Structure formats: structure tokens, C-alpha cells
């Protein structure tokens, strides 16, 4: 009699859903107030002029304008700001 014993269950086979992080609006792009510019974990990018910081560190536009990325300060931090059009 050809029989096969039941295989043991595997301990793998789990993975978390991707969080879709990253830059959503790039430098020079026009944005409206409220548009999300960057979704991030921690402050990889810091909020500059006319940019708000959400509780999950999301950067969003406070006014309409163009997105500008810049590196400033002694620690070479990356800032995102909005310039009025």
C-alpha cells in the first residue's frame, strides 16, 4: 500500500504588507495645500517653509506652490519646502 505520512506544517509563509513609503512629489512639481510630499519612517527629510509634519512623520504642503529639496545646516540635513508660484 503506497501511503505518504502527513507533512509537517512549515514555519515560514508570512510577510508584512508593503507600506508604500517614499517621495510622492519630486522637486519642481506643483502641489496644492494638503498634498503629501514624502511618506517616511522617522525624519529622513525635515519640514522646511510651508511644509507640515504629521504624527507619522509624513511631510505635506501647507500652501500651494512648487516643491524644493535642499541640504542645509552643519549636519547636512535634507529639507523640503514649498516655494510660492
Swiss-Prot record:
Keywords: Ribonucleoprotein, Ribosomal protein. It comes from the Bacteria. InterPro entries: Ribosomal_bL27, Ribosomal_bL27_CS. GO terms for molecular function: structural constituent of ribosome. The keyword Ribonucleoprotein applies. GO terms for biological process: translation. The keyword Ribonucleoprotein applies. Residues 1-22 are annotated as: Disordered. One of its GO terms (cellular component) is cytosolic large ribosomal subunit. Belongs to the bacterial ribosomal protein bL27 family. This is Large ribosomal subunit protein bL27.
Amino acid at each position: 500500500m503506497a501511503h505518504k505520512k502527513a507533512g509537517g506544517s512549515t514555519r515560514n509563509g508570512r510577510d508584512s504588507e508593503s507600506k508604500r513609503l517614499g517621495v510622492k512629489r519630486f522637486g519642481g512639481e506643483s502641489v496644492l495645500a494638503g498634498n503629501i510630499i514624502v511618506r517616511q519612517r522617522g525624519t529622513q527629510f525635515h519640514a522646511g517653509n510651508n511644509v507640515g509634519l504629521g504624527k507619522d512623520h509624513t511631510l505635506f504642503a501647507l500652501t500651494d506652490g512648487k516643491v524644493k529639496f535642499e541640504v542645509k545646516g552643519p549636519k547636512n540635513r535634507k529639507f523640503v519646502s514649498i516655494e510660492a508660484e
